[in-house]
């Protein structure tokens, strides 16, 4: 365990902050004086070659850690767990011609890292990023942020669950209705599609169920698959 320092903070969407720390990698946690450190795993939103360590953190009212992280100022320090973990390794799901990245809220983070690197998703001809959140303002600002950071050709679609927008509704519902495929001009088939999911547990669970019905599953016990997931908690 070691200490890292915040070098910059900016709000990229309502209550969603980009936090840039000094390296190295791992999980971050904030420890108050006299308390045990509170650790949470956050996906890294930057290239391994970057000088700083970047995260997207949504400030959740009443949360044990996120409000404190989002209130940090440059120069403040946090504790870092040196053990980095992750499941979204695109090399584990080869094949297909289209990679779908489906994110809710700050689950966008790993896809900022992937689309900001020209080599990570180079095996696929088409890259589709779908961002879901409650409000149109949040998804629009997250989409603008993703577009500004991308270094590869990228189709970005947004879905606001509580307001009218480019797509209206939760991502699983848009998959079930066919609206998401129609908007993207691409299909969820095991032959063509590879999926990366990062977001809240309900979104992950429902999307996996819908994909299983289409024979799109995670690789397991040596069997190939087409889908990888990373849950926010």
Question: Model-derived features: where do they sit?
Answer:
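Ferredoxin-reductase
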Residues: 1-74
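A short, basic/flexible loop-to-alpha-helix module at the beginning of a structural domain
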Residues: 84-94
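Short helix-loop-beta connector
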Residues: 92-98, 189-191
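Conserved S-adenosyl-L-methionine
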Residues: 96, 119-127
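Conserved beta-strand elements of the Class I
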Residues: 99-102, 196
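Ser/Thr-glycine-rich phosphate-binding loops at phosphate-binding pockets of nucleotides
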Residues: 104-109
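Histidine-anchored nucleotide/phosphate-binding helix
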Residues: 110-120
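Reductase modules of NAD(P)H-dependent flavoproteins
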Residues: 130-233
